A protein has these predicted regions:
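Cys/His-rich microdomains that often coordinate metals
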Residues: 17, 39
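Internal gly/pro-rich beta-alpha loop/helix module
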Residues: 171-210
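A phosphate-binding glycine/aspartate-rich beta-alpha loop in the early core of alpha/beta enzymes
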Residues: 67, 75-138
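Flanking scaffold residues of small Cys/His-coordinated metal-binding clusters
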Residues: 27
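Short, small-residue-biased leader/transition segments that mark boundaries at the very start
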Residues: 2-6, 211-212
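Short, cysteine/histidine-rich loop/knuckle motifs that typically chelate Zn2+
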Residues: 12, 34
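Cys/His-enriched microdomains
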Residues: 8, 30
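Divalent-metal (Mg2+/Mn2+/Ca2+)-assisted nucleotide/phosphate chemistry catalytic cores
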Residues: 124-126, 131-185
Length: 212
């Protein structure tokens, strides 16, 4: 209830939350570095909570061709460098998914234009707050196993700060981003489900705490 939320807030967030004239009055997304949301990662069974350390670790692993898991707005995603054949092949092994195409998270709209054909309507959809996956005709290849035998590519743009922070540290134009579950299994939503399905298959899993 609102009382529980109130008790867990820092003084600054609490003041915004209870002041009727404040634009954040009883707003669900009231947040700060103290109250969260916050990320943590499990790496070699060690819990890492420093955000800069999390970013540096995940960026290094992605550069090295590893597959990582990260919780999105809903469930987990499996992520790798979309240019790395080694990484995408490894992702297919983890997913047990031979031929189905993967969706790709691009750095920005300029890089989308480098790899696919897009018109104004499609770009407007890509840039909208909903950040949908838009199926577009491919212009040039990323790793060939991203969408084997296909002439189209599922494209989307960053919709979380974590995505933009990754691209600031990486030189790749795009990351493969697919649901964090093994084929025929339901999508992983909780850390426990991610651990059960992905243990031993990936080096690190990122989880955010969006709610108190």
């Amino acid at each position: 209830g609102l009382g529980d939320v109130y008790k867990r807030q820092c003084p600054s967030c609490r003041k915004e939350y209870i002041t009727v004239s404040d634009r954040r009055f009883h707003a669900e997304p009231v947040a700060c570095n103290h109250c969260g949301p916050s990320y943590y990662a499990l790496y070699n069974k060690v819990k890492v909570t420093d955000y800069s350390e999390l970013l540096n670790l995940s960026s290094r692993l992605l550069r090295e061709g590893e597959v990582i898991a990260a919780k999105g707005i809903g469930g987990y995603h499996l992520i790798c460098d979309a240019r790395s054949e080694k990484a995408v092949s490894r992702l297919r092994d983890i997913k047990q998914r031979d031929g189905m195409p993967f969706a790709v998270l691009f750095r920005d709209i300029e890089n989308i234009r480098r790899y696919v054909f897009s018109n104004g309507v499609e770009e407007k959809a890509l840039l909208s707050w909903r950040r949908p996956i838009v199926l577009l005709k491919q212009l040039r290849l990323l790793a060939s196993s991203v969408n084997p035998g296909m002439e189209t590519l599922g494209c989307m743009l960053p919709y979380m700060p974590l995505h933009s922070d990754w691209f600031e540290r990486l030189d790749t134009p795009a990351l493969v981003m697919t649901s964090g579950n093994i084929s025929e299994c339901p999508i992983t939503i909780t850390p426990e489900e991610a651990e059960k399905q992905l243990a031993g298959k990936i080096p690190v899993s990122y989880t955010h705490l969006r709610a108190h």
